[in-house]
């Protein structure tokens, strides 16, 4: 992956919804992580978000945020005023596909947060998940 990541074209990268960098932890960092959500708690939150999506999209041809069409994004990805201002500020850096992917991921983050609208922090988290390394030296495998 390290060798070829820099060769992947932007249109191909645009088809990836989430790209996140992981860093290696040393022993002390791993052992002193504090309280974290258990896998069971995370699973429960994801299942609740899926129920929210299934209910929201009842009667539609799709069930989940990842399946939204461009029209679906317009209808269901309602932004708070500060989220809209933030998105307007970064819009020129996005492709149309990237714009829609960010909104779909932000909608999912808002669902996990039980939020009716997408807020700025949901949107900025989604943007972070679209931050691809600029060269192959930052890619962890």
Sequence positions of predicted segments:
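Basic, amphipathic alpha-helical bundle interface domains used for macromolecular binding and assembly
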Residues: 1-140
